A protein has these predicted regions:
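Short, flexible coil/turn micro-motifs enriched in small/turn-prone residues
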Residues: 47, 69-72, 123
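Basic/polar, cationic surfaces and motifs that engage anionic cell-wall
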Residues: 1-12, 50-54, 58-60, 76-83, ...
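Surface-exposed beta-strand edges and their flanking turn/coil or helix-capping segments
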Residues: 21-24, 69-72, 100, 141
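Generic structural signal for short, flexible, solvent-exposed coil/loop and linker residues
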Residues: 35-37, 43, 72-74, 115, ...
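Short amphipathic alpha-helices and their capping/turn segments at secondary-structure boundaries
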Residues: 63, 68-77
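Short, conserved "active-site rim" segments that organize catalytic pockets and cofactor/ligand binding
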Residues: 1-67
Length: 154
């Protein structure tokens, strides 16, 4: 068990308007290669669907610790001290160019989720995946600027 230090925001790196299911994410992450990554656990705690609904992928006890059964594989080197959330989207229609494709419903759901999370865990840094791995464009939007726009200063 480790202290929770980060909430990482991710995108699924799928085209704008393409819904993603929990089953797809499980297949991408837990199926053996070459179909998936062969991980024991999916990479995200919660999935933000296009309609703004939020689906829990990995249960957790919502405290300030990351227990072994709560660890998700969203960012190498940070998983034991992080929770990871993901929105469906993140790529332009060409399927290659990073783009903030969040729907209005996803933006509102993520805003509510992050504000609630920050209220319960004010010591936790909320970051985009690319802030911890510069090789990534994920989540395809400027998380620090967005946090400031919703009233969170870190």
């Amino acid at each position: 068990m480790a202290k929770l230090k980060y909430l990482l925001i991710h995108c699924t790196a799928t085209k704008a308007g393409r819904e993603v299911t929990a089953a797809e994410i499980r297949r991408w992450h837990t199926s053996p290669p070459p179909v998936g990554r062969g991980w024991k656990q999916v990479g995200y705690t919660d999935l933000f669907h296009l309609d703004g609904s939020v689906e829990r992928l990995v249960r957790n006890n919502e405290d300030d610790n990351v227990d072994s059964w709560e660890i998700t594989n969203g960012a190498a080197g940070f998983n034991s001290v992080s929770r990871h959330v993901v929105y469906a989207g993140g790529l332009a229609a060409d399927g290659k160019t990073p783009q903030d494709t969040r729907t209005a419903a996803q933006k509102e759901a993520l805003r509510k989720y992050v504000l609630d999370f920050h209220e319960r865990h004010p010591q936790v840094m909320i970051v985009g995946h690319h802030q911890l791995n510069k090789a990534k464009a994920c989540p395809s939007f400027d998380v620090p600027a967005w946090l400031e726009s919703i009233g969170i200063k870190q």
